[in-house]
Amino acid sequence: MALGDTIKRLFSNEEDDYYEEDGYEQSQQQEQQTTQQTSSQPRFVRQTTQSQTPAGLNSANSKIALFEPKVYSDSRSIASQILGGEAAIVNFTQIDEAQAKRILDFLGGTIYAVNGEIERIGQSIFLVTPNTFEISGTLTDNLEPNSRY
């Protein structure tokens, strides 16, 4: 019957109940200690906070990188820039139209992930920004409607 007793002990909850009771007592003691500590502290504590600007909005930390991709794999470095919280200006004059569209599609997914924006600022030139940048104004009125991209 030693085998039966061993199996019974393995599936028995007697030890589990013992440990659960110990944990309950410890948590009760910890709660009592924390209430004693908080009651000895003053009720009204004045906390001063300094107004901090987010890292992306601080003009000293904001960067805009210039990219002129020549192959599709250059899109990874542009995406890394955006994911790092920095803006990029991308000039597609050195790449064919099909590759430029693929890169724009890739960057569109990256921008969607960080809730950013892509803005066309010239013929074959785009401004790509994460959500920490704000773009105001439009340049599309000055661009040709049937031009590249």
Curated annotation (Swiss-Prot):
Q: Name one GO cellular component term.
A: cytoplasm
Q: Amino-acid biosynthesis among the record's keywords?
A: no
* Low complexity composition bias: residue spans: 25-41
Location relative to the cell: Cytoplasm
Acidic residues bias spans: 13-24
Q: Where is the composition biased (Polar residues)?
A: 46-57
Q: Which UniProt keywords apply?
A: Cell cycle, Cell division, Cytoplasm, Septation
As for what it does, the entry says: Cell division protein that is part of the divisome complex and is recruited early to the Z-ring. Probably stimulates Z-ring formation, perhaps through the cross-linking of FtsZ protofilaments. Its function overlaps with FtsA.
Task: Tell me how this protein assembles.
Answer: Homodimer. Interacts with FtsZ.
Q: What is this protein called?
A: Cell division protein SepF
Q: Origin organism of this chain?
A: Leuconostoc mesenteroides subsp. mesenteroides (strain ATCC 8293 / DSM 20343 / BCRC 11652 / CCM 1803 / JCM 6124 / NCDO 523 / NBRC 100496 / NCIMB 8023 / NCTC 12954 / NRRL B-1118 / 37Y)
